[in-house]
Regions:
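Glycosyltransferase catalytic domains, chiefly GT-A lineage
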Residues: 98-106, 139, 145
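Short coil/turn segments at beta-strand junctions that form active-site/ligand-binding loops
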Residues: 46-48, 67, 111-113, 136-137
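A short acidic, Gly/Pro-enriched loop at the edge of an enzyme's catalytic core
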Residues: 105-115
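Class I SAM-dependent methyltransferase Rossmann-like catalytic core
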Residues: 3-47
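Active-site glycine-rich loop that binds ribose-phosphate moieties when present
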Residues: 101-103, 120-123
């Protein structure tokens, strides 16, 4: 029963039931593995800036932990859903054109972001454009890298 207890206390069962990634207390979680979440959480600092290609529960999770989250979303329905929950330190943009979506990061100076998450569309182009925008010790997260 230890494994079942972990599934409950981690929020995994609740996430399955709700259809979104949340912890036991219904707080948002990135849809990453639990070890990945723990690894990233240990590295986060309150003055970090995060850029996300694709918004979601991770947007809300990062927003609770860092200074600024900038997310670009291509899906209008998902954009509206996340926008309704986003706190003040989240800048969320809707860009349906895949080239404009990938290039949104170019609005920011090189070395501006501590973490860049690539989850949404046009991943190859996003990867080409984003690496210069990282700080010297920055981290790029390729989420669901098997997606096209």
């Amino acid at each position: 029963m230890t494994n079942l207890n972990y599934l409950e206390t981690s929020g995994w069962l609740k996430s399955l039931k709700e259809g979104k990634s949340i912890d036991y207390n219904s707080n948002p979680l990135p849809w990453y593995s639990y070890p990945a979440i723990e690894f990233i959480e240990d590295k986060l600092k309150s003055d970090f800036r995060v850029f996300e290609y694709g918004s979601g529960q991770s947007t809300l999770w990062y927003a609770q932990r860092v200074k600024e989250v900038i997310s670009v979303e291509h899906n209008p329905d998902y954009f509206c859903q996340i926008k309704s929950y986003a706190p003040e330190n989240v800048i969320l943009s809707l860009l349906e054109d895949k080239e404009k979506y990938a290039a949104e990061i170019n609005r920011y100076n090189d070395g501006y972001f501590d973490i860049i998450v690539i989850y949404g569309i046009n991943r190859g182009r996003c990867a080409e454009l984003c690496y210069r925008k990282l700080t010297a010790n920055g981290l790029i997260i390729f989420d669901n890298s098997d997606r096209e």
